[in-house]
Amino acid sequence: MNIQVKPGATSPHVKTQSLVCGTLVTTDLKRARRMYEEVLDMECVEPEQGLMYVREKGHQQGQAKHGKPYWVLEVRETPEVAVPQEMLNHWGFEAPSQAAVDEAFAKVSANKADYGITRVQKPFFRNGSYAIYMTDKDSNWWEVEYRTPDLIYTALREKGDQFQD
C-alpha cells in the first residue's frame, strides 16, 4: 500500500517535541543490566520493580545533554519473551572507527557467555557501515557500527530523499 503525501501539507497531525524512548523486554533485569553497563557502557536505573531505564552515560541533572537526540530504552522484565526479535529489529551503537568495531568483536566474542550474549556476527560491511551484530538471551539484537562521515545519519538526512516511487 502506498500512502500519498498531500502536497503543501505544513502541519503534522501529531505535534511532538522529540523521540524519547524505545521499549524492549528481558526475562532477567540483573543479567540485562550487567550487559548494558559492562559491555555497552550504558547507564541504568531501576525506578521500580520490573522496570529499568537505560541511556548513554555522561548526562548530569542541569547539564546539557550528551548527544541529541537524547533518549532512553525502557526495559520491562517479563516471564517470557512472547515475540522473539529478528536482526532487522536491532538497537545500534556508534563506534569511533573500524578498528573499534574489530576490538568490540574480539572482546564481546571472548566474554559472551559471561553476559548472556548468544551470538556475535563477524564484522562486515553493509549499507555503507562496518558493523557487528549480537543477540542476547532475550532475542534482542544489538549493533556496533562505524560509518564514514559522509554516511552518518545527519549527512544522509541532509541529502534528503534519494528514492521516489
Predicted regions mapped to residue ranges:
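N-terminal beta-strand motif that seeds the catalytic metal site of vicinal oxygen chelate
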Residues: 1-30, 91, 150-165
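Core segments of cupin and vicinal oxygen chelate
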Residues: 14-16, 23-72
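Vicinal oxygen chelate
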Residues: 27-30, 91-138
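Exposed loop/turn and edge beta-strand positions of beta-sandwich/beta-sheet ligand-binding modules
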Residues: 48, 87, 128
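Short, solvent-exposed loop/turn elements at beta->coil junctions and helix N-caps
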Residues: 51, 78-80, 120-125
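Helix-adjacent hinge/juxtasegments
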Residues: 76-95, 99-100
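Short beta->alpha transition motifs characteristic of CBS
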Residues: 77, 125-127, 133, 144-151
